[in-house]
Amino acid sequence: MPDQSSMRALRPGAGRLLAGALLLTATLASPLALAALKPGDKAPEFSAPASLGGQVSTFSLAAALKKGPVVLYFYPAAFTSGCTIEAHLFAEAVDRYKALGATVIGVSGDDIETLNKFSVSECRSKFAVAADVDKKIMKAYDAQFMKVTGYASRTSYVITPDHAILYEYTDMNPEKHVQNTMQALEQWAARQKR
């Protein structure tokens, strides 16, 4: 059994190890560590298979931006509790987004067959959800959960017609994504009228 002096010698090293582990955990868990694209950054172009009301088409960011701003939201997986809540919230708000000229698109790593069902039952056929099975869109937008999993982080972007990121919000709680993106979009629309 070690004596008290050798125990004291072990504690400082153990303390530094513990502090380092806590710092790493806090950094990885921080919402700020999840999304790197910031306001003013150019939004990466993408096209992907998407489902709206169970009907598959190709969603093109460039084509959507020709019509107005885009609210792009990433979510971890269809039919999970938080993602279902978020889909319902976006579906309830989609008419307000459309009144501001905006298109809403959700993106996850789910396959298109799953999204066909999700787009009808949870998105209520109000907006499209795109399949990013190869995770290229998530990577381009730095929206991978913890950067190592196959799931998207819960990250929302507002992108203006000039392909610029206007607003970014990352939080695994789905409750504020609609409220915050709507507020950013309304402020942008008000500035456009001046």
Region spans (language model):
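Bacterial N-terminal signal peptides that target proteins for export
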Residues: P2-A21
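Boundary of Sec targeting at the N-terminus
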Residues: L34-A36, D41
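Short loop/turn microsegments at loop-to-beta-strand junctions
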Residues: P44, P69, S153-T155
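A short beta-strand-turn-helix
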Residues: S47-P69
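Short active-site neighborhood of thiol/selenol oxidoreductases, capturing the structured segment around
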Residues: L61-T84, H88
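Structural microenvironment flanking redox-active thiols in thiol-disulfide oxidoreductases
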Residues: T84-C123, K135-M138
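Thiol-/selenol-based redox modules, centered on thioredoxin-like
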Residues: A152-R194
